[in-house]
């Protein structure tokens, strides 16, 4: 089996391991499930009673509801944190980025359709944050080489940030005690970044350990503080050194889970 299909399978199994109590951030026009890395929004379509028959009225209302749902996803994305100091709204000010995102949203999955006796329709759509959306909203301009020689001591990284009020984001960073990056999106391979993003999120360390993403031998570290923005997590100098001095293949593959109290 090639490595790209393997990534797809791993991504699916990671989602399957999500907790019953997902990390959900409520936004004005929708919500983000940071456990499954998806954004969900609902659209409504009113009936056009001037149409010739019931089927035409329903179809027209369903189409209108879907367009409204896409519009609400776009609005919801404005509130999604790329980093805690960089909301999606900033990226979407760019007309080209906004047009690209609108095109990607056409591929969102309809997860529920509700029909009403008056002919109105509600449509619920769900879109994956990782992949095209994340890389379009915040492309990595340059990549950093990571240490890939030596013994592969760890299969993943779990950062216990419970109690630090760390905020989920598309591009969180892990910093040392001096504020220098130990892990960031620029260290992740481009194809991996598109496949599953920079990091996943969990509510407990036990839940994180059950995520197949981090493998059987993850390094577990405790966050000591937050950086200048709440999606940047600081770890001790000792833990940072441990990360820098080992084979970092697991970082290049974004095998990272951040444990947090939630948004």
Locate each region found by the language model.
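Bacterial N-terminal signal peptides that target proteins for export
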Residues: 1-4
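Compositionally biased, low-complexity segments
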Residues: 9-10
């Amino acid at each position: 089996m090639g490595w790209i299909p393997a990534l797809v399978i791993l991504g699916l199994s990671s989602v399957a391991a999500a907790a019953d109590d997902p990390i959900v951030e409520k936004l004005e026009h929708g919500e983000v499930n940071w456990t499954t890395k998806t954004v969900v929004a609902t659209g409504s379509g009113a009936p056009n009673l001037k149409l010739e028959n019931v089927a035409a009225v329903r179809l027209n209302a369903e189409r209108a509801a879907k367009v409204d749902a896409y519009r609400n996803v776009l609005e919801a994305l404005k509130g999604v944190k790329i980093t805690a100091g960089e909301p999606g709204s900033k990226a979407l000010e760019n007309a080209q980025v906004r047009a690209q995102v609108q095109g990607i949203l056409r591929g969102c999955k309809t997860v529920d359709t509700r029909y009403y006796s008056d002919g109105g329709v509600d449509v619920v759509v769900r879109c994956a944050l990782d992949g095209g959306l994340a890389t379009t909203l915040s492309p990595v301009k340059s990549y950093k080489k990571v240490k890939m020689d030596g013994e592969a001591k760890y299969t993943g990284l779990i950062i216990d940030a419970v109690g630090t009020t760390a905020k989920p984001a598309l591009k969180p960073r892990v910093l040392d005690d001096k504020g220098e990056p130990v892990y960031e999106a620029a260290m992740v391979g481009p194809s991996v970044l598109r496949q599953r993003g920079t990091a996943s999120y969990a509510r407990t360390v036990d839940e994180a350990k059950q995520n197949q993403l981090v493998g059987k031998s993850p390094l577990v570290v405790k966050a000591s503080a937050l950086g200048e923005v709440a999606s940047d997590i600081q770890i001790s100098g000792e833990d940072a050194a441990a990360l820098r001095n080992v084979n970092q293949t697991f970082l290049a593959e974004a095998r990272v889970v951040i444990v947090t109290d939630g948004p």
